[in-house]
Amino acid sequence: MMRIALFLLTNLAVMLVFGLVLSLTGIQSSSVQGLMIMAGLFGFGGSFVSLLMSKWMALRSVGGEVIEQPRNETENWLLETVRRQSQQAGIAMPQVAIYHAPDINAFATGARRNASLVAVSTGLLQSMSRDEAEAVIAHEISHVANGDMVTMTLIQGIVNTFVIFISRLIAQAAAGFLGNRDGEGEGNGNPMIYFGVSMVLELVFGILASIITMWFSRHREFYADAGSAKLVGREKMIAALQRLKTSYEPQEAGNMMAFCINGKSKSFSELFMSHPPLDKRIEALRSGQYLK
C-alpha cells in the first residue's frame, strides 16, 4: 500500500512540476520540447525518488533490522568486518542490517557512497564460512565504493526518458495521421489512438531498454567481484561464488536484485539477467580480466 501511495505522490509531483515548467516557459505540452520535458521528468523522477528512499524501501521489503548495538558475537563480527572493509575502500561506515531469509544473499543500497546500507541474510551468516562471508561483504562494499547505485539510477533515468519520449512522439504522429484521416480530433489527433499506441510502444521499448540496463548491471557485478578480490583476496571471492551455487533461489524483490550478490538464475535469456552466470563470474576472477 505504501509503494502505491509513493508511486501516486511521485507522479503527482512530476505532473505539478511539468505544468509549472510549461506555464513559465510558454511551451505547448504537445510540442517536441514539451514531450522532452515530460519524458525527462517522468524518466528521472521515479528513479531518483527510489534512490533517495532506497534504504528505507529495501529494509521494509525484506524486513531487515539495522544493528545499532551488537547483541552477539556474529553481529559484532559483522560490524567489525564492514567497518574494516569500508575503511580500506575509502568510504564512510555504512549502516549494517540483517534480514531473515534462507537463501545466501546480501545487498547494498543508498543514495550516496557515504550514506549507504549493507544488509546480509541469515542464510548467508548460517551457511557461509567467515572467509566466504567476508568476500560477499567486500563485494557489496565495492558496489558502494564504485557508486553503482547512482550509476544505475542515471542509466535507468536516461533509458526511461528515451522510452517515454520516442513512444509518445510516434503515438502523437500516429494519432494525428489516423485521427485526421477519419475526420476526428479536429487536427489534434485521436486521443484514444494516442494513448493506445503510446502504451503499447512503451511496453515494447521498455522490454528492449531492459536489455541495456541489465547489461550494465551484469558489467557492474564483474567489477564488484574484482573489488572484493582486491579487498580480501581472489580465492575467497571464488570460494564465495562457488558456495552460491548451493544456495536457494533468491527471494528478494525484483527491484533489489541488481545489488544482491546472488541474482535469480531463472530467466528467459541471459540478456534479461541482472547478474552474470556464476561460472562466468568465477572465470572472470581466475583470468583477472576485471582486476587490471
From Swiss-Prot:
Cofactor binding annotation: Binds 1 zinc ion per subunit.
Cofactor dependency: Zn(2+)
Its membrane topology: Multi-pass membrane protein
Gene3D superfamilies (UniProt xref): Metalloproteases ('zincins'), catalytic domain
EC numbers on record: 3.4.24.-
Compartment list: Cell inner membrane
Molecular-function annotations in GO: metalloendopeptidase activity; zinc ion binding
Primary location group: membrane
Keyword Cell division found: no
Keywords from the named record: Cell inner membrane, Cell membrane, Hydrolase, Membrane, Metal-binding, Metalloprotease, Protease, Transmembrane, Transmembrane helix, Zinc
Pfam families: Peptidase_M48
Enzyme active site: 140
EC class (word): hydrolase
GO CC field: plasma membrane
Coiled coil regions, renumbered to chain: none
Any single GO BP term: proteolysis
Transmembrane segments: 4-24, 34-54, 158-178, 192-212
HAMAP family, A to Z: Pept_M48_protease_HtpX
Family: Belongs to the peptidase M48B family.
Name of the protein in its database record: Protease HtpX
Organism of derivation: Serratia proteamaculans (strain 568)
